[in-house]
């Protein structure tokens, strides 16, 4: 039976309307010759792109991105064709790339069944003896949950750890702000949870854009995280009988979230911090606070240290090690206004990217649906209201636009609006999940209602989060338990408030301090805001970037959440990476360094990197501009929010790229940094961070423009269902976008890591 492959360009308009630089889809058809002599198409793929100027009839023979050739038909027949079954071209492309060593991306995912990959991998990685560990240094940049847990565990194993953070203390890391909880597949509620369900919910929540093996590993180790934290003394909430309590978060139908009131991040960070302090006291961790990473140093192709700036003295310092671990968090502050701490930045990760590490899925950003709305242009920070509030709070807007206008103008109180005049739109649209749909779904729905004129605050960009029903429900339950009159409305209301206060008291207090309204008596006002970044440095299964010896963990990497993170999974990933994954995988790399000896920081590579940083700082300090750093940061944030926020389109993304390019040129021409570089200078620190944001912002827009589909938090207006839901394109975009740095950001090279799913069926997400 004869077989052949053909290649053709997919023209969507007359050929003469294209320019030579236009990128077209290549259609690959695999034919099977039937007994009657006719050819039948048994499979076709349109996942490859080619610029018109690069196309010719022999394009496929030379193109390294898609090495399938007609001469490969024997390979196809031997490896992929079983009688009349069609070939899976996505799997074929992956196999061919790996067999010919063409792709620069090697995920290093172990072979074998999905549920055995991690245990098998752990049993086969090389180890380093305790006697050799004491001679090996590891630098960890960032001491939040991921970095702090990694520092403590690596030092406990015997490595010498050099930890760096730009805060006064690792207790000031942004991890402390996490509120709602941490997921784990312990099934304490007996509601059908399991490792597989946590794995599946995470894959589905990420809209099938994450690496299957990494996500399953995360679900596997989740239970161990809870055991570790309980052993440290983390005061998780408990039921009356003393068992650990759970609650639900968005995108799931079980209760698997462990929590410590509304301060879960703080308590988990204190656990990691205490473990770190034990190793600091033993001399195994050298803690360097108020130090900011300026560059990574690569010697003989390996990460061997970093350059830092002492934020107090301004001194540029050289620090060497056998490996470097980045745990520097996400880049939400690219938007200027976000729920992130003011100092959170992308600089450490971006410096590594500029030295050769690929940056994955930069446009995959999470917009959290429950945040305190923007109240004015003077703001520089937004405040999160935990997703846990959606367990008991009901989200609504008025059914009638005229009622919304009256509420905005102060003519009507929300508590005076009848139930029949309220639109609980999430419950209406998604009856199965209701108010606990995933964050990207809830955020887009809130935006749609406000854009349609139903917003309830003065700016028209807010919806209500109402606890009145929960207060009465809990109050009646409490009254029944106590044998009290459930018809006594004031008594029931008082009892219900007590239950809500026990669950969310600190969150309600924080809301009242900021907004000056009592959420026990009137609904909260909320609106989506930038909260988390799923994108980050590309890493393999071992959490190593494309720079040997350089690892990225926690929010600094792209690893586990695809196009949308489920609530309470950030803390899970950070602690999984730090406590359980990295300490196992890094040994395999460091096994080659047991005879290396100390790494010198006096090499030409270190000196060159230090000189380059000093020159850059001198250039910024001597600039004769007149505009503040915040002036540029705020404009950048508005460009990104308006053009690359909750919804995107080709026109706006192209506009954003041009605007950011123009803004970056103006920044280096007009920025003014006051003070001097040899003392504490927050203006200088900000300027260096914003300079990196101005480059990342362009790549962010380029990435969003290149992905012609909607998935998770990446919503392209051109690609949506009739109901306004995200419309994925699995044939063409089932891959991780990994970008190679180019000084001309718009020309950054895209590498694709194709995603294969063994245990999950690809289907459109539905939460109805």
Predicted regions and their residues:
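An anion/pyrophosphate-binding glycine-rich loop and adjacent beta-alpha core
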Residues: 358-509, 584-587
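Glycine-rich loop(s) and the adjacent beta-strand/alpha-helix scaffold that form part
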Residues: 323-378, 382, 564-584
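Glycine-rich FAD pyrophosphate-binding loop
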Residues: 156-179
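Long, amphipathic alpha-helical stalk/connector segments used for oligomerization, subunit docking
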Residues: 588-679
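N-terminal helical hairpins
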Residues: 34-37, 42-107, 111
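Extreme N-terminal leader/targeting segments of oxidoreductases
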Residues: 105-138, 156
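Conserved redox-cofactor binding core of oxidoreductases
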Residues: 230-315, 371-384, 464-466, 476-478, ...
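N-terminal Rossmann-like FAD-binding beta1-loop-alpha1 element of flavoenzymes
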Residues: 136-163
């Amino acid at each position: 039976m004869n077989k052949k492959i053909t290649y053709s360009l997919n023209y969507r308009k007359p050929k003469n309307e294209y320019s030579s630089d236009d990128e077209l889809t290549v259609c690959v058809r695999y034919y099977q010759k039937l007994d009657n002599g006719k050819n039948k198409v048994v499979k076709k793929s349109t996942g490859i792109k080619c610029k018109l100027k690069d196309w010719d009839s022999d394009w496929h023979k030379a193109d390294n991105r898609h090495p399938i050739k007609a001469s490969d038909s024997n390979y196809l027949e031997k490896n992929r064709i079983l009688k009349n079954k069609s070939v899976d071209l996505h799997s074929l492309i992956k196999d061919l790339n790996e067999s010919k060593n063409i792709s620069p991306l090697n995920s290093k995912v172990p072979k074998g069944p999905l549920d055995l990959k991690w245990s098998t991998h752990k049993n086969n990685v090389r180890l380093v003896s305790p006697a050799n560990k004491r001679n090996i240094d590891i630098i960890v940049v960032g001491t939040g949950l991921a970095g702090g847990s990694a520092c403590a565990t690596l030092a406990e194993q015997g490595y010498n750890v050099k930890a760096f953070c730009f805060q006064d203390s690792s207790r000031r890391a942004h991890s402390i702000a996490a509120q709602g909880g941490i997921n784990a597949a312990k099934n304490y509620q007996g509601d059908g949870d399991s490792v597989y369900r946590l794995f599946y919910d995470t894959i589905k929540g990420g809209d099938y854009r994450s690496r299957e093996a990494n996500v399953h590993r995360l679900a596997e180790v989740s239970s161990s995280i809870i055991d570790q934290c309980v052993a440290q003394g983390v005061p998780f909430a408990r039921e009356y009988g003393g068992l650990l309590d759970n609650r639900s978060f968005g995108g799931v139908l079980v209760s698997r979230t462990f929590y410590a009131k509304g301060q879960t991040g703080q308590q988990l960070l204190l656990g990691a911090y205490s473990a770190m302090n034990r190793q600091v006291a033993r001399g195994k961790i050298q803690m360097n606070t108020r130090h900011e990473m300026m560059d990574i140093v690569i010697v003989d192709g390996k990460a061997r240290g970093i350059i830092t700036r002492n934020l107090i003295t301004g001194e540029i310092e050289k620090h060497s090690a056998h490996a470097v671990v980045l745990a520097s968090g996400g880049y939400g502050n690219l938007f200027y206004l976000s729920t992130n701490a003011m100092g959170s930045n992308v600089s450490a990760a971006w410096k590594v990217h500029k030295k050769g590490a690929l940056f994955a899925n930069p446009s995959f950003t999470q917009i959290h649906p429950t945040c305190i709305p923007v109240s004015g242009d003077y703001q520089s920070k937004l405040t999160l209201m935990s997703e846990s509030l959606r367990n008991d709070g009901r989200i609504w807007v008025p059914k009638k636009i005229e009622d919304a206008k009256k509420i905005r103008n102060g003519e009507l109180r929300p508590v005076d609006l009848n139930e029949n005049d309220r639109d609980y739109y999430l419950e209406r649209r998604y009856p199965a999940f209701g108010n606990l749909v995933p964050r990207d779904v809830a955020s887009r729905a809130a935006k749609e209602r406000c854009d349609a004129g139903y917003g309830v605050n003065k700016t028209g960009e807010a919806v209500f989060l109402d606890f009145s029903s929960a207060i009465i429900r809990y109050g009646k339950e409490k009254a029944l338990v106590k044998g009290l009159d459930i018809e006594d409305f004031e008594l029931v209301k008082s009892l219900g408030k007590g239950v809500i206060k026990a669950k969310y008291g600190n969150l309600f207090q924080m809301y009242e301090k900021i907004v000056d309204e009592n959420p026990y008596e009137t609904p909260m006002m909320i609106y989506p805001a930038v909260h988390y970044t799923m994108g980050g440095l590309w890493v393999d299964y071992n959490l190593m970037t494309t720079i040997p010896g350089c690892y990225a963990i926690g929010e600094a990497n792209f690893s586990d959440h695809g196009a949308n993170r489920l609530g309470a999974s950030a803390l899970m990933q950070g602690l999984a990476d730090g406590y359980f994954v990295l300490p196992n995988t890094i040994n395999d790399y460091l096994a080659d360094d047991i005879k290396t000896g100390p790494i010198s920081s006096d090499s030409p590579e270190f000196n060159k990197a230090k000189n380059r940083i000093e020159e850059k700082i001198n250039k910024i300090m001597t600039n004769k501009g007149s505009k503040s750093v915040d002036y540029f940061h705020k404009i950048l944030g508005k460009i990104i929010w308006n053009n690359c926020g909750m919804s995107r389109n080709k026109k706006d993304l192209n506009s954003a790229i041009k605007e950011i390019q123009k803004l970056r040129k103006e920044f280096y021409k007009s920025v003014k940094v006051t003070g001097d570089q040899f003392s504490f200078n927050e203006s200088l620190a900000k300027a260096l961070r914003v300079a990196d944001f101005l480059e990342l912002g362009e790549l962010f827009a380029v990435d969003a423009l290149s992905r012609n589909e909607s998935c998770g938090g990446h919503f392209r207006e051109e690609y949506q269902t009739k109901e306004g839901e995200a419309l994925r394109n699995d044939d063409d975009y089932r891959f991780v976008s990994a970008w190679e740095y180019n000084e001309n950001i718009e020309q950054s090279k895209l590498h694709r890591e194709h995603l294969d799913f063994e245990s999950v069926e690809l289907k459109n997400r539905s939460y109805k």
